[in-house]
Every structure is written in structure tokens, then in C-alpha cells.
A protein has these predicted regions:
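Acidic, low-complexity central loop/insert segments
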Residues: 63-153
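Extreme N-terminal starter segment of soluble prokaryotic enzymes
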Residues: 1-3
Length: 220
């Protein structure tokens, strides 16, 4: 199997051009290639496939083999690959995903894509569509008991479920413990990616995220 490894701000995947080859049992392949000790090492596997409704399709699998619906960083890399390797030859493209068709604008310099902007669409806040179990129509700054501690969460979907938790101090957060507890909480039937956010000032936030078995930190 020929592959390309790419990343968007550290969110790395193994990409396979399925215009040229077929991947049998992609769930098993995703588990194998994602292993950072015995495989290639990645957050998952993304297959770039032909599509009847868009310029190409992104078929993604998480590192545990489960199928994913959408990844903003992943789809930007799909767009770069598709242009750089001749699948598309235009700077405005469409990519089919499990969460619908996404539209991307490419910046091309010297024949190669240098930047990609993706229209992720409007955020989904309706609880049943995310999905998150709640008596309320929307979960915005609502309490959730996780491992005996109350966290105030906002639930949103941009193609897959996210829980956003604002905290006063995230430096001492045990993300490897609390991350899986959020991910597998009964309130999230399709599991959840969790972002813990500390506001530093009006221009700066610090985040720690737990995304399907992987923790990472960012600042902006």
C-alpha cells in the first residue's frame, strides 16, 4: 500500500490515494498504521476516494479503527494532496464527507498548495443532532458530572461531537485521566472530543484537547 503522511497543526493522518488503489478492511489498517510504536504513527487513516457528488471523498478512520465523520485539519490535507497530485486542477474544490459536502479554497504558490481554507458550515447546537443526552434543546454551559466532579460544558458539532469546558486553570488538569472519562460518558452516545479552555486575556486562550484517544495542547 502506498501512503502519504501529512499533518495540519500537528493533527496527523496517513493518507491513501484510492483513485489508484483499494484498501481492504480500512478499520484494521487504521489501527495498524496509527500505532506510534509498531506502525507508522498517526491520529488515523484517511482514504481519498472518487465521488459522484464532489471532486473527491474523504473517508476517515480514527486510530482505534472507528469511522470518523469530519476533521477540519484532515480535510485541508486532503485538498492539498488532491491538487498537488493532480486529482483536481482548480483552486475552489468540494470534498464529500460523512457530515456532508465541504467547500475549500486553495492558495497555490509555484504550483503547490501553500494554504487551505475550509467552510465548515454552521455549528450544530441542537442536543439530539450532536448528539448529547439532555432534557434541554441545547447544552450551553450546563453541568455534567464526570468522575464525581461537576464540569460546565457546551456541546457543539462541526461534523462530530465536541464538548467545550471553560476552566480557570488547565495546567494541572490530568488530561489522560479526564479525557477518556468525557469521551466515553453516557451523555455522549457517539463519544465526544473535549476541549478544555483557559482564557488568558481578551486576545489569548490556552487549550488542552482530548480527541479520540489522543491528547494535545494548543495556544492562540
Amino acid at each position: 500500500m502506498k501512503f502519504t503522511k501529512m499533518h495540519g497543526i500537528g493533527n496527523d493522518y496517513v493518507y491513501v490515494n484510492c483513485f489508484e488503489e483499494t484498501v481492504e478492511n480500512p478499520s484494521a489498517v487504521a489501527r495498524y498504521v496509527s500505532d506510534r510504536h509498531f506502525g507508522i504513527g498517526s491520529d488515523g487513516l484517511i482514504l481519498i476516494k472518487p465521488s459522484k457528488i464532489a471532486d473527491c471523498e474523504m473517508d476517515m478512520y480514527n486510530l482505534d479503527g472507528s469511522q470518523g465523520a469530519m476533521c477540519g485539519n484532515g480535510i485541508r490535507c486532503v485538498a492539498k494532496y488532491a491538487y498537488d497530485y493532480g486529482i483536481v486542477n482548480k483552486e475552489h474544490i468540494s470534498v464529500a464527507t460523512k457530515s456532508g459536502i465541504k467547500y475549500l479554497d486553495l492558495t497555490v504558490e509555484n504550483g503547490k498548495v501553500s494554504q487551505v481554507k475550509v467552510n465548515m458550515g454552521s455549528p450544530i447546537l441542537t442536543a439530539r443532532q450532536i448528539p448529547v443526552v439532555s432534557e434541554k434543546e441545547e447544552v450551553i454551559n450546563e453541568p455534567l458530572d464526570v468522575n464525581g466532579k461537576i464540569y460546565y460544558i457546551t456541546a457543539v458539532s462541526m461534523g462530530n461531537p465536541h464538548a467545550i469546558v471553560y476552566m480557570d486553570d488547565i495546567d494541572h488538569l490530568d488530561i489522560e485521566k479526564i479525557g477518556p472519562a468525557f469521551e466515553n460518558h453516557v451523555a455522549f452516545p457517539d463519544r465526544v472530543n473535549t476541549e478544555f479552555v483557559e482564557v488568558i486575556d481578551e486576545h489569548t486562550v490556552k487549550t488542552v484537547s482530548y480527541t479520540h484517544l489522543r491528547a494535545h495542547e494548543t495556544g492562540a
